[in-house]
Amino acid sequence: MKKIIHKAASRGYADHGWLKSYHTFSFASYQNSERMNFGMLRVLNDDVVQPEMGFGTHPHRNMEIISIPISGALSHKDSIGNKRSIEVGEVQVMSAGTGLKHSEFNDSKIDAVNFLQLWIIPEIENITPYYNQKIFEALERKNKFQVLVSPKDRRVGGSLSINQQGYISMIDLDKGFEIAYDLRNGAYFFLIEGEVLIEDENLEKRDAIGIIEKDKVYIKANKSSKLLVIDVPMI
């Protein structure tokens, strides 16, 4: 087994006024040669967008982009005809492929939006861009792994599909609950809330651990916790 630990305080940080962003991996002005990626996971940003602010229209190409709201709602528009709102409990997937443009905006006059954005390197380049989003019921992840995203050729249940052999799961853990996660590739465990013990490493809010070369990973919740698991090829 090999593991890498990323404490919350070790992340890059940028304060643009309208946007406060924590970067797990090198992104924009935050550049760290030892924090470029975890396998095919290239970006994990923890963003807070202020009321009535947002990301103007900008392009992407050949990247799988997954957004997961933690609080608040974002209005989405893109160049392939989608105009949607994405809220807590939903997951959004964009496969940028040959290229698309999009914007994300916080329409609220009062509340900030906190969301996670993940970029995963695609398996096949220059595919036709596509977009999807879905509501995932919280009860389906209570003390069990709920698969949010899976490969388009090996889709799991009602999960959203991406152009990569990657899986993204979420679990809401009760205090004291123990569970094992079966690795498909390498897995990056990002703790959204709470406190957990993973392979003898104590993780608190926004801490993370990446694990490879192991079949099962053992998890125990020291507090009620919300855990995101990003399982991706390492090469």
Model-flagged regions — what are they?
Residues 1-235:
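Jelly-roll (double-stranded beta-helix
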